[in-house]
Amino acid sequence: MKCAGQIEARAVEESSINLDPIQAAGRLTPEAMKAVIAWGDGYSVCDNCHKPFRLDYVTKPPIADFHEEAAKWLGMDKIQLVPGARRAFQEVTGALVGKGEPVIMTGMGHYTAYLSVEVVNGVVREIRPTADHHITADAAAESIENAVREFGYAPKLVFVDAVDFMYGNMHEVEKIAKVAHQYDIPVLYNGVYTVGVLPVDGKKLGVDFVVGSGHKSMAAPAPSGILATTDEYAEIVLRTTKIQGDITGRKFGIKQVGILGCSLMGDPAVGLIASFPRVKERVNHFDEELKNHKIVTDALLSIEGTKVASEYPRKHTLTRMDTAGSFDVIARTHKKRGFFLSSALNKRGITGIMPGVTKQWKFNTYGLTKTQAEYLADSFIEIAEENSMVVG
């Protein structure tokens, strides 16, 4: 079915169990779906934008209220809506990092974090991951010390991934923040896989910035995200314009410089707000998500030669599997090669695992019901047995 011209109507979430790691927690709530239809027109959220002419002051829809509520929810002082987490990274580096200045990165960070340093001509110095793919406070301290010796001063910022996108492992955020603050370095908590999925309290963690992704983990349309900060850094990162035209004398009120005046508009903003009540509630039930995830990982581990490449037992629903000794062995002689696994899953209404990959692959069960998790587990077992693999 086409919804317009050559644009096919998307029915992945309705027709399949979707295991794509970046899509699992971004599925819209029914409330967001309705809000998207109602507020889809261009500058719709500007219907009631009056003095001081800034989106976070708009009360209809309740954008202003959302800013206050979300800041409290994250244990921070101020928030700003942004078009995706990457724009939050860019806004922070744009305010804090200068040409040639060092920024500490985890070594397992998303490419957009690196690019946010590159765009301001900064320099990245990485924290070396452990052999089991963790970022530790000791390793962070070593990287900071190395940077101090190299540059003669402390790095301008430390990025910390709460849960990394490669393995879905959890890292020592609170301990790393304490180390960074010993050098007076601000800490950015990258919560794209936690904000909206797990409880997050920035002040308890001791971080200066919390970044969340609306379309990845807060059941919101893309592009959407949140930048939360403390009062101390709000004055710097969320600063307002001071520029003035030399001929006209024009000024621009309290427009924010880092976001070029106005933040998130239209469907991304209203969809994020519409999903928020459910998102606030669901973070309290992550233990149930882990139970469902365990059903699937237990089934996979029962297939001889299969391992969990991520930390184990699992603490997150994004997991990297190592099937080099199981599914990849079959792929070497199967007529479909590495595509046999995704093909077999697709026949069972399961999608989201990268086609052609059988050595190591990621999946995310967030949002699945117990029944769906059991079906998924049974499907992996069936595929293994169909290919004469040892299960038990």
From Swiss-Prot:
Gene Ontology biological-process annotations: translation
Similarity remark: Belongs to the SepCysS family.
Key word tRNA-binding present: no
Reaction(s) catalysed by this chain's protein: O-phospho-L-seryl-tRNA(Cys) + hydrogen sulfide + H(+) = L-cysteinyl-tRNA(Cys) + phosphate
EC number assigned by the record: 2.5.1.73
Lineage: Archaea, Methanobacteriati, Methanobacteriota, Stenosarchaea group, Methanomicrobia
Subunit structure, as described in the record: Homodimer. Interacts with SepRS.
Disulphide-bridged cysteine pairs: none
PTM annotation (N6-(pyridoxal phosphate)lysine): residues: 216
SUPFAM superfamilies the record matches: PLP-dependent transferases
Function recorded in the entry: Converts O-phospho-L-seryl-tRNA(Cys) (Sep-tRNA(Cys)) to L-cysteinyl-tRNA(Cys) (Cys-tRNA(Cys)).
Enzyme class name: transferase
Any one GO molecular-function label of the UniProt entry: Sep-tRNA:Cys-tRNA synthase activity
InterPro entries referenced in this protein's UniProt entry, alphabetically: PyrdxlP-dep_Trfase, PyrdxlP-dep_Trfase_major, PyrdxlP-dep_Trfase_small, Sep_Cys-tRNA_synth_arc, SepSecS/SepCysS
Transferase as UniProt keyword: yes
Pfam families: SepSecS
Cofactor(s) recorded in Swiss-Prot or TrEMBL: pyridoxal 5'-phosphate
Name listed for the protein in its UniProt record: O-phospho-L-seryl-tRNA:Cys-tRNA synthase 2
Positions bound to pyridoxal 5'-phosphate: 85-86, 190, 213-215
Species name: Methanocorpusculum labreanum (strain ATCC 43576 / DSM 4855 / Z)
Keywords, alphabetical: Protein biosynthesis, Pyridoxal phosphate, Transferase
